[in-house]
Amino acid sequence: MEKAAVIEWLDAYIKAWESYSPEAIGALFTEDAIYFFHPFEEPVRGRKAIVESWLKDQDPPGTYQGTYAPIAVDGNRAVVQGRSRYFKDSTRSELTRQWDNVFVMEFDDAGRCRSFSEWWVAPRGQA
């Protein structure tokens, strides 16, 4: 996996998160993918379950903003750092929550993610 392909995948990830399109979400992952939302919890297993987990608690349209970039790519593995920001409404004039993120991902040869683990840290004092 080349760095440019990881960047393309991250762009598609952001678009899928913004749209909540089941097709766009599903296209990111292999059929048997595993997704760790939290390192101390069981992962979500399988593309269908991952799509369903994304669709459970949707943010209002236009309130999410993500910026992510690969910091290391080795074969089919990538480590990504970025920021997830959430706003009061779609004007994005009032930031309500944000997290610094690290993703560790493994891809298949077609560029679909087969393993996704994320860690996130909120600013001190954020509820």
Regions inferred by a protein language model and the residue ranges of each:
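Short hydrophobic/aromatic segments of transmembrane alpha-helices and their interfaces
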Residues: 32-34, 96
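A beta-strand edge to alpha-helix "cap/lid" segment located at domain peripheries
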Residues: 5, 51-127
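Short, low-complexity N-terminal intrinsically disordered segments enriched in polar/charged residues
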Residues: 1-31, 127
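Hydrophobic pocket/interface hotspot
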Residues: 13, 25-26, 33, 46, ...
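A short gly/proline-enriched turn/hairpin at secondary-structure junctions
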Residues: 34-44, 57-60, 119
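Structured beta->alpha junctions
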Residues: 14, 39, 70-72
